[in-house]
């Protein structure tokens, strides 16, 4: 039976700022996967586009004195060009503000209405009396009702990460003018997401992709599934059918963009787009780990309600840190793709390698210039580049090219073993494992050449030296074929140095065992240049200056009097028990002895400590904080910690629980 085609999509970059390392964590692995799968004989279509709607773009456009459409077009062109420079080769890269996306969004929303999955409801929405406007999503900031942290109107981005519906945020403030907002009634439309609970659980059990996406979504659904408000009071966006005063929520039209972009590609290429979105499709979404909820719960529910096929797989990446700090544009912990990397003349292939080889796709990637330089020099230059150059140089110098004859069976067996392992890893979305396997073959080649020393052997046995080089050339060919999805530009350069005149990407990845014929080859040149310490230091200096500049811009905390400070009660405590909170990847529930009583405290440190690590640990507790419910769990106090990594404050010497901090 013929397999259905593979349609691969990437989460859409938002057109209100330039491309950075966090974006590439999604797009480079997706491109690597697409390149590999095509070269196994699969029919693959690769689409994405820019996300043009929603309040952040409207706010940014107003701040910059331009229109949302002009701002979107500016950054759409930027992303399109940047992805090309990074070797990310989409078949189609569209815009969600294009007519095709408007049409498909309104069609799907109308289907949901007709099928009874959408209803009207009056909600309390933040309203600015000064601006005389309702404040959807990021037009308003305030306090998260679940964890008490600073939050945006649609999401608690600084705390528990929970999606917020209109009217939920506490102490709302207008982001435009800073005026305290009030709540007023307004009619909106909701998707009956709760109606899909019985569908979503078995769907997730069968969903392919990475386990982090599947498990996170299952945790949400097993508790309570809330309906979603799918309209906003904005002029910019896709109009809700029959309502000129409302647009659909950006998380409705953004994923529908995947379908619209497929339609546009199909129209350009004489294909039927419905073939890629039928019931038995293989739609595979590559996304960042922060949008799992939208792609594994909201999106499949929406598709089901509208009568479309469900996603086949969701591949979610881990988050990105910079120099051990949480990725943050406002705090300066960001690496810009163009300004900091490509425009400095650094090879796109080396950054692709780092992103794929640093860690497993689902784990956190911590970028530092120092480690980047070390890995490129020690792995790419010293192992891969060294083997390819020394082998090709010797072949050209001593034999004028590739010697004739056969390849040792043991060498072919090693190549076949490598090809099989790479395929297993790629099919499982384990890109680091695949890269490590390829680099293992390069290391094997280096050891083989070093052990057999053809530069010595040729003095006494030219035929034996020729056999060693023949074997080395065969390994080099296999490496070219296997590394192409990771480093497409350098793989093509190597392919030409092997004497081929076509594209390496036109060949199957398993052709590494097809013998390289006897022929002349051009004089090779080193494929990779070492990154000098001075260059790395200069790149790092730019980052550190950016952090310092951001610190200067940070608003200083106002001074307080000793009387104000005396109102705060801080004591030592000892953790008696700790456990995870269902559905939250950030929060732990702790039982803490503070001297004479045990307090239950919810703390956002789950990303840094396992529950059993905390039991018995001495901590510092703010004890007279008003009780609050966080994620539905009562919290009576606050554990004090320092920095983005939540380093717990603890006494240097043993003290009794309940000792006051003075």
UniProtKB/Swiss-Prot annotation:
Positions annotated to bind Zn(2+): 144, 147, 156, 160
Top-level taxon of origin: Archaea
Annotated GO CC locations: aminoacyl-tRNA synthetase multienzyme complex; cytosol
Cofactor note: Binds 1 zinc ion per subunit.
Any Pfam family: Anticodon_3
Catalytic EC class: ligase
CDD domains associated with the record: Anticodon_Ia_Met (cd07957), MetRS_core (cd00814), tRNA_bind_EcMetRS_like (cd02800)
Binding site for ATP: 329
InterPro entries the UniProt entry points to: Anticodon_Met, Met-tRNA-synth_bsu_C, Met-tRNA_ligase_1, Met-tRNA_synth, Methionyl/Leucyl_tRNA_Synth, MetRS_core, MetRS_Zn, NA-bd_OB-fold
Residues covered by the tRNA-binding domain: 564-662
Biological process according to GO: methionyl-tRNA aminoacylation
Motif mapping: 'KMSKS' region: 326-330
Record's subcellular location: Cytoplasm
Keyword terms, alphabetized: Aminoacyl-tRNA synthetase, ATP-binding, Cytoplasm, Ligase, Metal-binding, Nucleotide-binding, Protein biosynthesis, RNA-binding, tRNA-binding, Zinc
Segment forming the signal sequence: none
The keyword tRNA-binding belongs to this UniProt entry's keyword annotation: yes
Cofactor(s) demanded: Zn(2+)
EC number from the UniProt entry: 6.1.1.10
Motif 'HIGH' region per UniProt: ranges: 13-23
Matching PANTHER family: METHIONINE--TRNA LIGASE, METHIONINE--TRNA LIGASE, CYTOPLASMIC
Record function comment: Is required not only for elongation of protein synthesis but also for the initiation of all mRNA translation through initiator tRNA(fMet) aminoacylation.
Record note on quaternary structure: Homodimer.
Family to which the UniProt record says this protein belongs: Belongs to the class-I aminoacyl-tRNA synthetase family. MetG type 1 subfamily.
Matches recorded under NCBIfam families: metG, metG_C_term, PRK00133.1
Full protein name: Methionine--tRNA ligase
Organism: Methanoregula boonei (strain DSM 21154 / JCM 14090 / 6A8)
Gene: metG
């Amino acid at each position: 039976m013929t397999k259905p085609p593979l349609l691969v999509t990437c989460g859409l970059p938002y057109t209100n700022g330039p491309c950075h390392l966090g974006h590439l964590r999604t797009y480079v692995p997706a491109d690597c996967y697409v390149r590999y799968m095509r070269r196994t004989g699969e029919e693959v279509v690769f689409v994405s586009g820019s996300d043009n709607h929603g309040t952040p773009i409207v706010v940014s456009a107003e701040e910059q004195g331009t229109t949302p459409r002009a701002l979107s077009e500016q950054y759409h062109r930027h992303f399109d060009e940047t992805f090309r420079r990074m070797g990310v080769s989409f078949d189609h890269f569209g815009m969600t503000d294009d007519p095709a996306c408007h049409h498909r969004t309104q069609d799907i929303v109308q289907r949901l209405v007709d099928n009874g999955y959408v209803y009207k409801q009056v909600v309390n929405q933040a309203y600015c009396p000064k601006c005389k406007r309702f404040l959807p999503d990021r037009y308003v900031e305030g306090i998260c009702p679940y964890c008490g942290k600073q939050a945006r109107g649609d999401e608690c981005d600084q705390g528990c990460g929970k999606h917020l519906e209109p009217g939920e945020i506490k102490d709302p403030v207008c982001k435009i003018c800073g005026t305290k907002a009030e709540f007023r009634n307004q009619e909106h439309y909701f998707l009956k997401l709760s109606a899909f609970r019985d569908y979503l659980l078995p769907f997730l059990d069968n969903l392919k992709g990475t386990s982090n996406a599947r498990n996170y979504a299952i945790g949400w659904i097993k508790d309570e599934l809330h309906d979603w408000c799918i309209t906003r009071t904005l002029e910019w966006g896709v109009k809700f059918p029959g309502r000129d005063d409302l647009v659909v929520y950006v998380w409705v039209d953004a994923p529908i963009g995947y379908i619209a972009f497929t339609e546009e590609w199909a129209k350009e290429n004489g294909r039927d787009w419905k073939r890629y979105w039928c019931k038995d499709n293989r739609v595979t979404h590559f996304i960042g780990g922060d949008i799992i909820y939208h792609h594994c719960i909201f999106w499949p529910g929406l598709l089901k309600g509208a009568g479309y096929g469900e996603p086949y797989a969701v591949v979610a990446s881990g988050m990105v840190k910079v120099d051990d700090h949480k990725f943050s544009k406002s705090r300066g912990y960001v690496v810009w793709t163009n300004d900091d990397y490509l425009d400095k003349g650094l090879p796109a292939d080396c950054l692709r390698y780092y992103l794929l080889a640093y860690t497993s796709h689902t784990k956190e990637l911590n970028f530092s210039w120092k480690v980047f330089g070390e890995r490129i020099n020690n792995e790419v230059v010293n192992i891969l580049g060294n083997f390819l150059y020394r082998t090709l140089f010797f072949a050209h110098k001593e034999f004028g090219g590739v010697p004739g004859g056969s390849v040792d069976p043991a060498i072919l067996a090693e190549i076949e073993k490598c090809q099989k392992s790479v395929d297993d890893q790629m099919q499982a979305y384990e890109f680091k494992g695949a890269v490590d396997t390829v680099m293992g073959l390069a290391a094997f080649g280096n050891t083989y050449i070093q052990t057999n020393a053809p530069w010595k052997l040729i003095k006494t046995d030219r035929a034996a030296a020729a056999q060693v080089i023949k074997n080395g050339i065969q390994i080099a060919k296999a490496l070219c074929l296997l590394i192409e999805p990771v480093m497409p530009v350098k793989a093509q350069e190597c392919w030409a140095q092997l004497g081929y005149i076509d594209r390496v990407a036109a060949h199957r990845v398993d052709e590494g065992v097809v013998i390289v014929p006897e022929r002349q080859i051009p004089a090779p040149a080193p494929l990779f240049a070492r990154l000098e310490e001075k260059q790395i230091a200069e790149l790092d200096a730019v980052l550190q200056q950016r952090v310092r500049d951001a610190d200067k811009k940070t608003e200083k905390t106002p001074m307080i009097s000793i009387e104000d400070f005396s109102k705060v009660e801080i004591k030592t405590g000892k953790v008696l028990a700790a456990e995870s909170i269902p559905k939250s990847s950030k929060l732990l529930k702790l039982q803490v002895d503070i001297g004479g009583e045990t307090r239950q405290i919810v703390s956002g440190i789950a990303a840094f400590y396992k529950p059993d690590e905390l039991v018995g640990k001495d901590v510092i507790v703010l004890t007279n904080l008003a009780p609050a419910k966080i994620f539905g769990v009562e919290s009576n106090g606050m554990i004090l910690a320092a920095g983005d990594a939540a380093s717990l404050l603890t006494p240097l010497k043993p003290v009794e629980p309940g000792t006051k901090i003075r």
